[in-house]
Amino acid sequence: MIRVGINGYGTIGRRVARAVSLQDDMIVTGIVKTKPDYVSMVASRDFKIFVPDKSYEKAFQDAGIKVEGTVENLIDDSEIIVDATPEGQGEKNKDLYVKRRIKAIFEGGEEPEIAQASFNAYSNFEEARSKDYVRVVSCNTTALARTLHPLRERFGIRYVDATIVRRATDPNDSKKGPINAVEPSLSIPSHHAPDLRTVMSGLNVSTIAIKAPTTLMHVHAVRVELEKDASKNDVIEAWRSYRRIMEIGKNSGITSTGQMMDLAREFGRDRSDLYEIAVWSQSVSVQGNHVSYIQAVHQESDVVPENVDAIRSMFDIADRDRSVSMTDSKLKIEKRVF
Amino acid sequence: MIRVGINGYGTIGRRVARAVSLQDDMIVTGIVKTKPDYVSMVASRDFKIFVPDKSYEKAFQDAGIKVEGTVENLIDDSEIIVDATPEGQGEKNKDLYVKRRIKAIFEGGEEPEIAQASFNAYSNFEEARSKDYVRVVSCNTTALARTLHPLRERFGIRYVDATIVRRATDPNDSKKGPINAVEPSLSIPSHHAPDLRTVMSGLNVSTIAIKAPTTLMHVHAVRVELEKDASKNDVIEAWRSYRRIMEIGKNSGITSTGQMMDLAREFGRDRSDLYEIAVWSQSVSVQGNHVSYIQAVHQESDVVPENVDAIRSMFDIADRDRSVSMTDSKLKIEKRVF
């Protein structure tokens, strides 16, 4: 049983904690929280709570939440830390992990240089093998790697051009905008293109990112120039053996991210999450070697299974297909075609 | 075991089906769907699917979904129908229920005259006892009845004035608006005031309804003139023995409906629902016999436990407190203070 500590229990940390706790080969040693808010109040039923340092303890005590110790205590009781602290904080935390000689996973908000390898289970599981510091790429990069990897493997890829319509913020955030404007990121390529190359080495890719006033999902319009001609059927077939890609057909009646997340609620999973990248099969269009498709990405959860697989790769306890199968089985990810 | 058929499997029908299936004293005999969409695709794993009439069968067969029969077949196999069809359709369906001599529950979109009694578990459980046709009032009316009933019981109520900031539509709907305007309902009182009197007989109440561009929850600003003076503590204390009222304190850090629904996701319930009416305890303000407070209402789910209790009242198999306890226990509704 790999002993996993979770430093940071926000959108990603909470979900990784739950996903790890569902696996047969790993357990959660505890979580680090900074505030005794509603998330801590619920979490304290399931997980041991640690704090960054002793100065945080009193607030938790006042709120009636038991604190087990500091992050150092959590590290001492763990074999790996998943650092899901806010963007940029992981870099500050790394010194501690190095000093205490503990493995660590960082999330996509950190720079690639923080880790020995960036990670996506489908496209480069092997590169994290036995590494001490690994970074799981962001939700958007994960999504692109998921659907592009099978195409690259089957047909080869000459060029990718993706337009990423980003959700403005997460559903629990009422501070950030925009609420009534569309906000393009004016430097092209957006940071997603180089980030994608950290898990799909040498990929020729450009990306444009545009923020839209929604909190539910990202939507990607992807254009791919393959190395050889394919048919629409070939493309869909290439995705068929990958459970983390979900086909959404015309009969499903799903035409928006609103319905897509409603579908996720029907699955009965933790937090009504949608781990799969949902590709509208109706949108898949092929002309010779040019493929276009549209996919929806649940930004809160698509990286969750990736974190679990990264742990297995770093401890060298399973190969890609076995790890992905174990993770998917516990998270109720099955191949679904709608 | 009471045999419950669900006619209409939209926002409310799906949730009532799940809630009924979790009880020890009732089972779901089947659900009626009109389209073989994503909801049907998932539902067919758990429930028998029926259709309004034979003309609907082919579409389901083409989508590979087994149809068990028509709504008449479902009625023949059931002891009660929960009619959660779209607003106004329940009235059309009632003839069939009368003809087939089956009990039926209607939802708040129907007119009160459709039923022998309107229903809220806290305020008038007894009025549905042994009745054949009962209407569970709408989400907003349910919410008002929940928090007003304990105040009326403890202090008496002279007058209520509530402003209802309504969510524009449900999260899975991308057709309706408004998306960027606030839309007051200009007739005062809004329909909620007379509706509330159907479950709180003789209550002196006025309501104003204003639509806001959000899909998450309704928010109510409630002002109550009690028959006698009270303190803030008295008011909160009056709610304390009611599990379906949840206290949200300042330490929780919850200041918006975004965080409120995020809290619900932490509970791990079906569809991440929030059955309780969430009252911000910080907002409770009392001056003599004048009380003000703000509450948030999850429009998709607050009526779900009410439907379960209405069934028990109609079959006269439990009194209010016993039914509510049974329902709450299976839906993981416990008294929570944040």
Swiss-Prot record, chains A, B:
SUPFAM superfamilies: Glyceraldehyde-3-phosphate dehydrogenase-like, C-terminal domain (SSF55347), NAD(P)-binding Rossmann-fold domains (SSF51735). GO terms for molecular function: glyceraldehyde-3-phosphate dehydrogenase (NAD+) (phosphorylating) activity; glyceraldehyde-3-phosphate dehydrogenase (NADP+) (phosphorylating) activity; NAD binding; NADP binding. InterPro entries: GlycerAld/Erythrose_P_DH (IPR020831), GlycerAld_3-P_DH_AS (IPR020830), GlycerAld_3-P_DH_cat (IPR020829), GlycerAld_3-P_DH_NAD(P)-bd (IPR020828), Glyceraldehyde-3-P_DH_2_arc (IPR006436), NAD(P)-bd_dom_sf (IPR036291). D-glyceraldehyde 3-phosphate binds at S138, C139, N140, T169, H192, A193. It is found in: Cytoplasm. Its EC number is 1.2.1.59. It catalyses: D-glyceraldehyde 3-phosphate + phosphate + NADP(+) = (2R)-3-phospho-glyceroyl phosphate + NADPH + H(+); D-glyceraldehyde 3-phosphate + phosphate + NAD(+) = (2R)-3-phospho-glyceroyl phosphate + NADH + H(+). NAD(+) binds at T11, I12, G109, R167, Q299. The active site is at C139. GO terms for biological process: glycolytic process. GO terms for cellular component: cytoplasm. Keywords: Cytoplasm, Glycolysis, NAD, NADP, Oxidoreductase. Pathway: Carbohydrate degradation; glycolysis; pyruvate from D-glyceraldehyde 3-phosphate: step 1/5. Its main location: cytoplasm. Homotetramer. NCBIfam families: GAPDH-II_archae, PRK04207.1. Belongs to the glyceraldehyde-3-phosphate dehydrogenase family. This is Glyceraldehyde-3-phosphate dehydrogenase.
